[in-house]
Amino acid sequence: MEDGEIEEGMVTADEFPTPEVTTIETIQPPREPGKSPLELLRESKTSVEEIVAKMLSMKKQGNHKSEIRELLTQMFLNFVNLRQANRAILTEEDKVKAETERAKAPVDFTTLQLHNLMYEKSHYVKAIKACRDFKSKYPDIDLVPEQDFFRHAPEAIKDQSLSSDSSHVLMPKRLNFELHQRKELCKHRARLEQQKKSLLETIAERKKFLSSLPLHLKSLKKASLPVQNHLGIQHTKKLKQHNLAELLPPPLYVLYSQLLAQKEAFEESIELEVVGSLKDAQAYARQQSRKDSGMSSNTESSRLEDDGPDDDDDGQRRRKRPKKLTSKEGSDKAGLYQVHPLKIVLHIYDDEIPDTKSLKLVILKFEYLLKLNVVCVGAEGSQDGPEKNIFCNLFPDDAGLEPPHQSTKLILGDGQTFDENRTSRPYKWVQHLAGIDISPVLLGQEAHNTDPAKSDTFVPDLSLYRQQHRVQTVLRRIRLRKKAHLALAEQLDLLMKHELPVVNCEDAPWALHKVLCALDSWLHIQSSASKSCSLTLNSVEQVPEPMEIDVDGRSISGKEDFESIREDGELPSLVTAAASLTSSNHTPSKVSNQARSRQLALMTKNLDSPISKGKSPSFKKYEDDLDLVLDDDSEIDEPTGRTEAHVEELCPEKADNSWVDYGSREFALVFSRKTDGGKLWKLEAMVQISMEYPLRPPLFSLSLHASSSSGNENGTNESDHYNELRAMEAEVNLHMLKIIPSDQENYLLSHQIRCLAMLFDYYVDDPSPDSKRGTATTVVDVGLCKPVDGKLLVRSFRGRDHRKMISWKGRGCASGYPC
């Protein structure tokens, strides 16, 4: 808007309309008496907005200047109305404030009265609480209950009006009864004092008689020796054993006391005796006492010499430096395995037979190494190698070769193990029985880990055993291990004679199956004790890549051959573990067995028996671990090769699982079967039997070969039967374990061999041609609990195979199953 226009449209006081223009003012009606100031304010505001809008529109058009003046006049009138409404609102506000001030006075008065009442109430509450908390002395007086008072109080103290008396009247009467009772007790005490004097005189006379008894008892003991030997009481022998036990070193004494307490408290089927030279033990005890007294005197004298000033050195204090050991003394290892003269011999009997002398399972000999400060145990009279050492891996990661604590490692030297030629070894559980607690040793990278949630991983598995019944747990495991090895030896003897062991189990289908194949050979190949017991991380990293590319860009890996044979994702659970059977130069037992044993190491670490099924909480963990292994293996999609960081993250324990294979034995099993067409099938199995049998089941690695009647190979390749062999391995190594009852766990090897023979018979009897074996569903694929009635069902879809192989969840055979 231009300035000229503004000046032209301004309205001054001289230009206010004359009385003739009052007709325009009458357009806006005055304030109606029924309207409130707020409504008048709103109407005036709305009218002003409308007038301003009209003036702006006329100003833009440039004409109707007379109308603009009229609108301006109306707007001023609205301003007057606005001021009038504002004045009315302020007047009403003052009126409301005055009314509020008048109403505030009674409210303040009422509030003051309320505060006074609340203060008075709090005063009364405090007074009531003080009265209630008041304690008098009479409740602390130890009086007889009221019922006893009414029952036993004499009539002189109580009267007939007691039922209506108040508690205040009753209390003095109860106090009088208490005084009466105490007087009676004082009289009774005087009588007891008289009896005590007479009894003391009698005791003195009997002590004189007892002092003369040892001479009579000594002569009586000598006379009773023939009777003791005849009755088998051996009381004198027990006293001698206790006297010998006093000369035992502290670790052996703790071991002896624990075993003896277990026998006496729970009637354990064991016998204890301390053997050795008594004179040598006494001489060693005197030598140790003189050595200890000499060390204490030398310590005191050296302390005095160190505290006294030297005259030649102007009173300056001089300390003695310890003498350095010569290299000859430091390198002398001849006396490291020096044994204490006394040993503990433990006879363990079968606890399932009532007569303890009917069957002696094993004899243990405990000895103490003086220089190494460890307790060793071994089977008495046993000169066998580690493959027959029943104490090897009695608990996880305890082969007996590693020094049990750090001081022993320092004495033996870095990287040195215990002498393997010794039959007795320092197992960790023996140290715990002897009271020698072993602290866990942290590695370099573990020492910097301060996470308390991960601190439990550093504690050895034997710490769980420390919180349980030590002696009972060890004896039970030794009995189970010995019985299992006796049953295993019986089965191995039959297999060496090329005879299949007989199993007695009605629930197992292979027990009722008539074996058609023949056992050609059973040979003992080697023992894993001769191998190295260490598995470095480099060996874990040297897993073959799924495919390698040569200079020409061609694949030179063997895994592609297997991938081309099977369908996409079919049976992926065992492909990686068994791919090295044909692609590497190692034997199947050397490669696949190690891979599978590491998978099974998790399952049997803290189990009492893998075949106890629902009878113990440990079997639930075993079934969970089986599912864990199958689920983990079934998801192998990425390449087998891993980076170093990935291996260290996912496999931190694989480098320490070499103890699993220590002491295990490997056998070669060959089944043969000749078909009607003149074709000869041979199923070769590498069987690895662990020292923890049957806790850790035997591991089977299979390979299949076929030849014609003329003896020539017919061109069959193991990859043609790859899926079936892996399914058989999974069945024999994992799934069939669920159906074996607990009373047959020691004959697990027989069940596995019988099951393998049955699967081999079914596979050979399969009428499908060789070209369709890899693409057809056989009895091996779908499981033995739901047979396919001898028919071959071709898969109707491609893609990853999510079938669960040979499930044994149902024990009953379906109709048509060839049991």
Swiss-Prot record:
MF-aspect GO terms: RNA binding
Keyword annotations from UniProtKB, A to Z: mRNA processing, mRNA splicing, mRNA transport, Nucleus, RNA-binding, Transport
Main location: nucleus
Subcellular compartments: Nucleus
Keyword Amino-acid biosynthesis: no
Self-association and partners: Component of the THO complex, which is composed of THO1, THO2, THO3, THO5, THO6 and THO7.
Function: Acts as a component of the THO subcomplex of the TREX complex which is thought to couple mRNA transcription, processing and nuclear export.
Family: Belongs to the THOC5 family.
Name of this chain's protein: THO complex subunit 5B
